Amino acid sequence: SPYLDSFSLKAFESIWTNRRFGRTLYPVTTRRKFITTTGSTMAAASIAPAADADKDAPLLSFGLIADCQYADVDPAGTRFYRQSAAKLDQAVNQLNRHDLRFSLHLGDFIDRDFKSFTELKPVITKLKSRLYHALGNHDFDVEEHLKSKVPSELGLTSTYYAFHHAGFRFLVLDTTEVSTYRYPGKNAATLSAQEELRALAAAGKPYAQSWNGRVSDRQFLWLTEQLKQATDAGESVLVFGHHPILPEEAHCTWNCGALHKLLSQFPCCKAYLNGHRHSGGHQFKDGMHYLTLHGMLDTQDNAFSLAHLHRSCLEIEGFGRQQSRTISFR
């Protein structure tokens, strides 16, 4: 097949079999590609050439995974739910070969059923680097009485938070905080979110979808304060979440316009990275990069990344279906 033809002899020699999940996995190969693309809102409007990544040494590297979305169920279309455990295991083994400061999973760690978290633990606990999670809509597709336990199951004491490394402030948002699925069905917050969704649909917004959500007003104020503090401290900022902000389409967070306006006002803010839209995407607007990573779940091929952070750019080294690219900072 074309997929197998793309492997080098060295890759064939390292074929390994995951007997637990009953299939042979071919290690994803990667090369660092530095892509300049024009003409599409889904493509990069400001992609650096390869030389830019060499202007300064990497400050640190970290792992990136989006939409593992595991469940012990049969495939449906292009979604291979059960196979995601083996894909995650493959990603963990690859990430463990590198000196990573941390790793991030950008939401939808599971597809459904609270037991799915337990079934992934033997895989994810092998990861050597510290793992941070952003919450996704499918993470709450569990029994109603267990919804409140999801954040702690993912090791979160707060559903949105900040951490610091090498002169950068990393902000992880909770774009599920206001949504129709986060809380039990008769909860006042759920009823309020349902009303908000109806209003967005009446206004013709493409992102008026039940699988989306937004940050709360309180979280928005927290984000604003974090950006102000980073500016005062001379820090650069990378922001992460599950739902896209741009380009504006059916997968975006409900308050994507307000978030874009806020982030673009702060020169310290360099990029927003997210999952949710499994086919990926990129847009550059008003000095900000908005990068959607490919979902691990889709197709039999894997998708994950190494991110190499430089002072002047972020180099994404993609594996499997994930494209490699370098985005230059303003």
Write out the residue ranges for each language-model feature.
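N-terminal secretory signal peptides
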Residues: 1-30
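N-terminal twin-arginine translocation
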Residues: 19-22, 26-33, 43-55
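N-terminal active-site segment of His-dependent metallophosphoesterases
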Residues: 50-118, 218
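Extended active-site neighborhood of metal-dependent phosphoesterases/phosphodiesterases
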Residues: 54, 114-233, 258-268, 282-318, ...
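Alpha/beta-hydrolase fold active-site loops
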Residues: 60, 101, 160, 168, ...
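Active-site neighborhood of phospho(di)ester-bond hydrolases with catalytic His/Asp-centered motifs
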Residues: 65-66, 103-107, 132-137, 238-241, ...
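Solvent-exposed loop/turn segments at secondary-structure junctions
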Residues: 68-71, 109-112, 137-141, 176-179, ...
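Short acidic, glycine-rich surface-loop motifs adjacent to enzyme active sites
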Residues: 230-247
